[in-house]
A protein has these predicted regions:
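TIR-domain catalytic/interaction hotspot
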Residues: 30-40
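FMN-binding flavodoxin-like domain, especially the glycine-rich phosphate-binding loop
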Residues: 5-8, 16, 20, 38-169
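A short beta-strand-loop structural module common to alpha/beta enzyme folds
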Residues: 19-32, 119
Length: 169
């Protein structure tokens, strides 16, 4: 993202996973082939504009998920385990809180991936989110604007829940 918050969360996740994870790759620099070589993926995105994926039409400075995701659509993701995380601002954008996360989720599910790491909606205050399925967020939700003090704790709890599904360890 333009603020670097998504990158910081990705790096924190990778650091906490240690040797179990490769270094994070910015989607701007990734190819579909890069992603498809892995059996397990952690994908993250901020929400920009009106609940949109980051990309040129949502005001991002570079191409991002908006341009990359169509390349991933239609790919066979069966046999892959995918965990998602999203960043949003529940106070400033509570009417579309982490909405972009649903686009990653729908693409993963449509491709046949096993999506893990659903996250409780408790502890957040927002009006609406499209990123909720079965009363849970489709991935870890980080609000760095209003709850940055909870970021590490949330990452730790989420990784504890998904680590074995992603790594087999």
């Amino acid at each position: 993202s333009d603020t670097g918050n998504t990158r910081r969360v990705a790096k924190s996740i990778a650091k906490k996973l240690g040797d179990l994870a490769d270094a994070p790759v910015d989607v701007k620099k990734a190819s579909v082939e890069d992603l498809l070589q892995y059996d397990a993926l952690i994908l993250g995105t901020p929400t920009l504009g009106d609940g949109e994926l980051p990309g040129l039409s949502s005001g991002a400075s570079d191409e991002s998920w908006e341009e990359f995701l169509p390349q991933l659509e239609g790919q066979d993701l069966s046999g892959k385990t995918i965990a998602l995380f999203g960043l949003g601002d529940q106070e400033g954008y509570g009417h579309e809180f982490v909405d972009a996360l649903i686009f990653l989720y729908e693409t993963a599910v449509a491709g046949g991936a096993n999506v893990v790491g659903f996250w409780p909606v408790d502890g957040y205050s927002f009006e609406k989110s499209n990123a909720i399925v079965d009363d849970q967020f489709v991935g870890l939700v980080i609000d760095h604007e209003n709850q940055s003090d909870l970021t590490d704790e949330r990452i730790d709890a989420w990784l504890s829940d998904i680590k074995s599904a992603l790594t087999g360890v």
